[in-house]
Amino acid sequence: MGANIRYSNDYALSLASKNGHIKVVKYLVSKDANVTHDNNYAVRYASENGHFEVVKYLVDQGADIRDCRDYAVRFASENGHLEVVKYLVDKGANIRALDDYAVCLASVNGYIEIVKYLVSQGANFRADNDYAVRFASENGYLEVVKFLVDQGADIRADDDYAIISASVYGHLEVIKFLMSQGADFRSKNNASIKLAIKYKHPEIIEYFLTQCTDVNTDIINIFYAYLTKLASKNKTAKLVEYMNIFCHIINKYDNCVKHLMP
């Protein structure tokens, strides 16, 4: 008695497709495996994982690329599989499904060529309160950020989320670009400054110091407040670490900040 290739809802075909084993996929289909089983699982996950030849074959065999709200093109975009994305679009995939998920997640993950392609095909890069530029900034993808801004993205959306999150994760070049485009690092009660201090990004703190005189006072005061908080909680190791950062900045910017020390 032969093996049941359709066992557990065509699980064999699902795994072969997901992992890109085109010869196995073709064999299973020749033995009557169902390419549309489980909401077209096979083509969805072959697309997500960038297995172009598998995707094409499954589509030729009748797989529905638009199942589960265009899962295939959304996750191919999120994972950077440009060839698969273009093929799916040619076959009628909706790149704007689920509130322009495709361009948003391609931006978040820094896949600039996919972002450019999706925008050229009509994707709304400003969907969900400029999600794309906000999270491309958070993840430090400067090229994507620049492209989106050139296309008209609002870098100040959601109370300057872009520059605030870039400050958390230490993306100095993104911060410089955002500020050149009008981002306000003083928004939300100096959130960018506070977070750059909290997450120990001295190069960003130093950059903020160069921007205007009154910022110096704010940075010194915020630094002292943070040091006081650490001292009150007996966090000696952290206190020493932050004191070292603080002293480095004081020494480097002696002329502009030393006179501000209480």
Curated annotation (Swiss-Prot):
SMART domains for the chain: ANK
Pfam families per record: Ank, Ank_2
Keyword Chloroplast annotated: no
ANK repeat coordinates: 8-37, 38-67, 68-97, 99-127, 128-157, 159-187, 189-217
Alphabetically ordered keywords of this record: ANK repeat, Repeat
Entry-linked InterPro entries: Ankyrin_rpt, Ankyrin_rpt-contain_sf
Stated name of the protein: Putative ankyrin repeat protein R848
